[in-house]
A protein has these predicted regions:
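P-loop/Walker A NTP-binding module and the surrounding RecA-like catalytic core of P-loop NTPases
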Residues: 2-167
Length: 167
């Protein structure tokens, strides 16, 4: 039963919010899906506003911001809204985290338990290089990843990180 939940996870500055909007746009335009995006990032100033602006630009709905709510509460509200309003896909844009930050990892696990995502995508900056392997392993230890998205592939990075993560 809809919605399919896609949870976006990754390190700070890897491009999760932009990638969330890009995937939402593709689902809307190519797959004809009704998509709701929700920002669970309560740590970075303007993160929720950034997703709202991107949503307006690509004409994809975003969950209204309610100040003071935590990530799990936002995820619960987003799931409820997506069900009630007949969305096919709910995209959860989580807070960027430093992989060593156990508090944020615990929060990510709680969101995963609450939302029971169909897909959990790890967003990795391709410029991370071979460190991407350790990043992927740390995230895999915490939540079951279903895929990896490499960002900034237009730079000087090689594809070695992708091959290493697959192994």
């Amino acid at each position: 039963t809809p919605p399919a939940v896609i949870m976006m996870v990754g390190l700070q500055g890897s491009g999760k919010t932009t990638t969330t909007a890009k995937i939402a746009k593709r689902l809307k335009e190519k797959e004809r899906k009704k998509v709701l995006m929700a920002s669970l990032d309560v740590n970075r100033p303007a993160a929720q506003e950034q997703l709202a602006v991107l949503g307006t630009q690509i004409d994809v709905a975003t969950l209204p911001i309610i100040a003071g709510q935590g990530p799990v509460e936002i995820a619960q509200r987003a799931l409820q809204a997506a069900k009630l309003q007949g969305f096919d896909v709910l995209m959860l844009d989580t807070a960027g985290r430093l992989h060593v930050d156990q508090q944020l990892m615990d929060e990510m696990q709680a969101v995963s338990r609450t939302s029971n995502p169909t897909e959990t995508l790890l967003v990795v900056d391709s410029l991370t290089g071979q460190d991407a392997v350790q990043v992927a392993q740390r995230f895999t230890d915490q939540v079951p990843l279903t895929g990896v998205v490499l960002t900034r592939m237009d730079g000087d990075a090689r594809g070695g990180a992708a091959l290493s993560m697959r192994a």
